[in-house]
Amino acid sequence: VQSVSNFILLDHLEDVMNPRNLSMTLIFGAALFISLFLLIGKLLSKLSEKNQLFLTAGIAILGVIIQYFLLIHIQAVLRYDHLRVFDGGLEILNTGHLSLTANDGYYGLYPFNISIAVFNSIILRIVKLFRIAEKYYLLSLQCVYLFLIDLGVFFSWKIVRILYSIKHATLFTLLAVTNPMLYVCAMGCYTTTLMLPLLMGTMFLFILFLKEQDFRKKLLWG
C-alpha cells in the first residue's frame, strides 16, 4: 500500500512540475496570495493602532516559537562554508589560533571568513563559560544566529512602520512569518545571517537621522 501511494504521489508531482503546469501553479498561487494579503489589509484598517500592535506581537511570537522549535527538532547538519566557519570557531576556541593552510587552505582562499570564525569563537567561548556540553555548541551558535535574524527582521519592521504605517508593518510581519526562508536560514551560521541586523540596523538609524529635526539627536543617530 505504501509503495502504491508513493507511486501515485510521485506521478502527481511529475504532473505538477511540468513547466506549463508549474507556471500556472505559480501564477495562481501568487494571485491567491496577493488577494489574501489585500483582504487582510482591509481587515487591519478596521483595527486600532494598539490592537494592530498586539496582533503584530502575537504573529512575531508565533513565528519565533516555530523557528526555535524547528531548529531544535530538525538539528540540521552544516555543510560547506557554514561548516568551515563553525570548525574555524572551534579551532580558535581550542587552540587560540586559526590555520590558513588547513582544509585545503580554505582561509587563505577566503580570508574574509576569518572574521566570522572569530565571531563564532567568541560565542562558543561564552557558551563554554556557562558549562554547556560540547554536543550543544552548534545548537547554541545557531540560536545566536537565529536571534540575529529576528533582530534584522525587527529593524525591518521599524523601517516599514516609520516610512509607511502600522498596517503595512503588520502586513510585513505576516509576510515575514509566512516566508519559508525565515526558517530555512535559521539553520545556517554564515555571512547572510550575521550581517542582516547590521545592515537593517544601519538603515534604520539612517532613516531616523534623515527624519530627525533636532540637530543634537541627528548627531546621535549619525
Label each residue range with its predicted role.
Residues 181-195:
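Short acidic/glycine- and proline-prone juxtamembrane loop motifs at membrane-interface regions
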Residues 87-88, 105-136, 146-147:
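Short hydrophobic/aromatic helix or loop-helix immediately within or flanking a transmembrane segment
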Residues 117, 121, 154-158, 204:
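Transmembrane alpha-helix boundary and packing residues in multipass membrane permease domains
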Residues 1-68:
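Start-transfer (signal-anchor) and selected internal transmembrane alpha helices
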Residues 63, 172-180:
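Short helix- or helix-capping micro-motifs
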Residues 28-32, 85-87, 91, 149-153, ...:
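Hydrophobic core segments of transmembrane alpha-helices in multi-pass, intramembrane catalytic enzymes
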Residues 41, 140-163, 201:
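Transmembrane-helix motifs of polytopic, lipid-linked glycan transferases
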Residues 163-164, 202-219:
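Membrane-interface transmembrane helices that cradle and orient dolichyl/undecaprenyl
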